[in-house]
Amino acid sequence: MKQDSRFPNLFILDHPLIQHKLTHMRDKDTSTRTFRELLREITLLMGYEITRNLPITTKRVETPLVEIDAPVIAGKKLAIVPVLRAGVGMSDGLLELIPSARVGHIGVYRADDHRPVEYLVRLPDLEDRIFILCDPMVATGYSAAHAIDVLKRRGVPGERIMFLALVAAPEGVQVFQDAHPDVKLYVASLDSHLDDHAYIVPGLGDAGDRLFGTKN
């Protein structure tokens, strides 16, 4: 895991397996089926990385030989909240890793001026719960920042929120950081820039279209 000096709350997950799978996802010739499988696999790997600092407590268990105090994750079950629609493809990998997690949804689409328009919010109970928001791309950063706003307006502090994405543009990370410096953003790659249409370059195309086999 590495950082970029420009963005204190950005963490780049540079594990070789993550980078290998991301390269295949970038390939325009990768099929919908393979893209979907890779998204699940890469999210599972990234989820493993970002949960390494979860709080731990102990539980008394009896092995076939003795009783011991063994480590377990402390507190309430985590919540996974994909940002619709492409974020749904990431929830499968996270649920494979954390099958007991609660699941919410935040629906946001990007208007013509690239600003987020919210159309759905469904969340589990919020008190004392750690949230993992997920969306494959942080382009302009407005949708990601808005999704965090949804949680914070309901009383979730920034230190209990993580945001997981595959690729991000520096412009979007700056918007994210300015809005929520207390929230950690985890990505597989910090890409070069946004083009004139606010697409990430080099990026991986429209993640939602590639995941669901639709045309923009």
From Swiss-Prot:
Pathway: Pyrimidine metabolism; UMP biosynthesis via salvage pathway; UMP from uracil: step 1/1
Keyword Coiled coil: no
Protein family membership: Belongs to the UPRTase family.
Binding site for 5-phospho-alpha-D-ribose 1-diphosphate: R85, R110, D135, P136, M137, V138, A139, T140, G141, Y142, S143, D206
Catalytic activity: UMP + diphosphate = 5-phospho-alpha-D-ribose 1-diphosphate + uracil
Stored InterPro entries: PRibTrfase_dom, PRTase-like, Upp_B, UPRTase/APRTase, Ura_phspho_trans
Regulation of its activity: Allosterically activated by GTP.
Protein name as annotated: Uracil phosphoribosyltransferase
Function per UniProt: Catalyzes the conversion of uracil and 5-phospho-alpha-D-ribose 1-diphosphate (PRPP) to UMP and diphosphate.
UniProt organism field: Burkholderia thailandensis (strain ATCC 700388 / DSM 13276 / CCUG 48851 / CIP 106301 / E264)
UniProt-annotated binding residues for uracil: I200, G205, D206, A207
